[in-house]
Regions:
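Short, basic/aromatic recognition patches
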Residues: 10-25
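Short beta-strand scaffold segments in enzyme catalytic cores
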Residues: 29-37
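Small-residue (primarily alanine) positions within well-ordered alpha-helices
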Residues: 16, 34-35, 64, 68
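Feature of Fe-S/electron-transfer and energy-metabolism proteins
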Residues: 3, 7, 11, 122, ...
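Short glycine/proline-enriched turns and hinge-like loops at secondary-structure junctions
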Residues: 28-29, 58
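Zn2+-dependent cytidine deaminase-like catalytic core
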Residues: 45-140
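Short beta-strand-to-turn element immediately C-terminal to the catalytic PLP-Schiff-base lysine
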Residues: 37-38, 117
Length: 147
C-alpha cells in the first residue's frame, strides 16, 4: 500500500466537507459527506439522504460507492468521511455496519484506506481491515460456489 500524499488527503477532506451542504437530513440533522478516491485517481462524492421510512435512507459512503459503480468504476483506493449534527464537525464519524459491508464487496480490506476527519489538521487513517477485522466478503464465497 502506497502512502497517500498530504495534498491528496487535504483534497479528499475538502471534497467530503463540501458534500455536507447537499446532505438531506430533515429527521436527524446529522449531515455526512464522503469523497471516494478510485485507483485511477478519480474522486466520487456522496452525502447522506434520509427518508421518512428510515430503512431507505442512504449513507454518504454508499452514495459515493454506488455512484462510482453505476459508472463502471470498481477499483477504490481511499474514502474520506466527515459528519456531524447540523454539519458541525466535532468528532470522527465512522462508517456504519452496512457501509462497511458494502466496502467489503468492492474494496481490498488490507489496502483500502478510510480517512475519518474533523478538518485538514485533525484526521486518522484506517484500513478497512482495521474496522472489519473478521469481515465477510466475496473471497468467502469463492469455494462455496462448488457446493
Amino acid at each position: 500500500m502506497q502512502n497517500l500524499e498530504k495534498s491528496m488527503i487535504s483534497k479528499l477532506i475538502e471534497t467530503a466537507m463540501a458534500q455536507l451542504k447537499f446532505s438531506y437530513t430533515p429527521y436527524s440533522n446529522f449531515k455526512v459527506g464522503a469523497s471516494l478516491l478510485t485507483k485511477n485517481g478519480q474522486i466520487y462524492t456522496g452525502c447522506n439522504i434520509e427518508n421518512a421510512a428510515y430503512t431507505p435512507t442512504n449513507c454518504a459512503e454508499r452514495t459515493a460507492i454506488f455512484k462510482a459503480v453505476s459508472e463502471g468504476v470498481r477499483e477504490f483506493d481511499t474514502i474520506c468521511i466527515v459528519g456531524g449534527k447540523d454539519g458541525i464537525l466535532t468528532e470522527y464519524t465512522a462508517p456504519c455496519g452496512v457501509c462497511r459491508q458494502v466496502m467489503m464487496e468492492f474494496c481490498d480490506p488490507e489496502t483500502f484506506r478510510i480517512i475519518l476527519a474533523i478538518d485538514k489538521e485533525h484526521y486518522d487513517i484506517y484500513t478497512l481491515k482495521d474496522l472489519m477485522p473478521l469481515g465477510f466478503g466475496p473471497r468467502n464465497l469463492i469455494n462455496s460456489r462448488e457446493i
